[in-house]
């Protein structure tokens, strides 16, 4: 082995990788684009990770310039660098786009019942969503049932109460039959839909986009063919009960539809 005072290029390369990942995380957090990848409640963890990576870069870079380097004439395996370079290259080369109808079609969707979360009612994510929905109803001067759905007037499905309201209606559609509902979502279809039917959904993010699941309702409209998959629309309609795939499900009979812009944050969270 040969030992001499020199710049350790291997450590410099590693330190630059750490710097790039740190800059990437800082950029995503500052620009708000981090919400395209993870649940906002985990943003603080991304901030801490960016700071940690920046600190690791400083230590690694300092050590590369101020230490003896031992040469054993064995170059580091290039695959190690490829593993780090690929994510950076993908971020730079691929468009930063939200999950769309094609992803929803590939992942599939079960319209049969309220199935948006795996947590039992009254616990975990559903408990937080229920409390939030109830607070929203009370602040608006509306009485709500134990699911947070308003007892009178149109049911307004918002980004804040989406999971709880859609779950509640999906689990007990008969209880909400005849109620008017207003909702924003995007269009999706599958091979089982009739020409006048489509799904109106949004992606639900629990932790990150890897676990994203589409949730929403079947909607009926004589103008259904006018709206292509992926089109964002605002709708107003009446909840009906129908059979789908041998199960009772809520179906919205649309009375009003208008095209809408995709929200700045297209996802909803439990």
Question: What do the PLM-derived regions correspond to, one by one?
Answer:
Residues 73-100, 112-113:
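Internal/C-terminal transmembrane anchor helices
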Residues 181-187, 230-239:
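OB-fold and OB-like beta-barrel modules that bind single-stranded nucleic acids
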């Amino acid at each position: 082995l040969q030992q001499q005072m020199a710049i350790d290029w291997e450590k410099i390369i590693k330190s630059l990788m750490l710097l790039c990942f740190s800059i990437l995380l800082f950029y995503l957090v500052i620009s708000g684009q981090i919400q395209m990848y993870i649940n906002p409640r985990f943003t603080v963890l991304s901030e801490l990770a960016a700071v940690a990576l920046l600190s690791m870069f400083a230590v690694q870079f300092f050590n590369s310039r101020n230490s003896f380097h031992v040469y054993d004439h064995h170059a580091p395996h290039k695959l190690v660098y490829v593993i780090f370079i690929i994510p950076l290259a993908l971020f730079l080369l691929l468009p930063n786009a939200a999950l769309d109808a094609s992803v929803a079609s590939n992942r599939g969707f079960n319209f049969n019942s309220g199935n948006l979360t795996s947590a039992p009612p009254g616990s975990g994510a559903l408990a937080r969503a229920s409390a939030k929905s109830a607070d929203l109803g009370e602040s608006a001067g509306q009485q709500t049932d134990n699911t947070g759905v308003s007892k009178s007037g149109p049911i307004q499905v918002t980004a804040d109460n989406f999971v709880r309201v859609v779950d509640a209606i999906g689990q007990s559609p008969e209880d909400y039959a005849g109620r008017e509902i207003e909702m924003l979502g995007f269009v999706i279809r599958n091979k089982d839909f009739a020409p006048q039917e489509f799904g109106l959904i949004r992606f639900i993010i629990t932790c990150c986009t890897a676990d994203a699941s589409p949730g929403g309702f079947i909607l009926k409209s004589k103008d259904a063919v006018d709206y292509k998959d992926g089109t964002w629309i605002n709708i107003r309609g009446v909840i009906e009960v129908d059979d789908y795939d041998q199960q009772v499900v809520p179906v919205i009979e649309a009375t009003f539809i208008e095209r809408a812009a995709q929200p700045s944050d297209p996802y909803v969270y439990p």
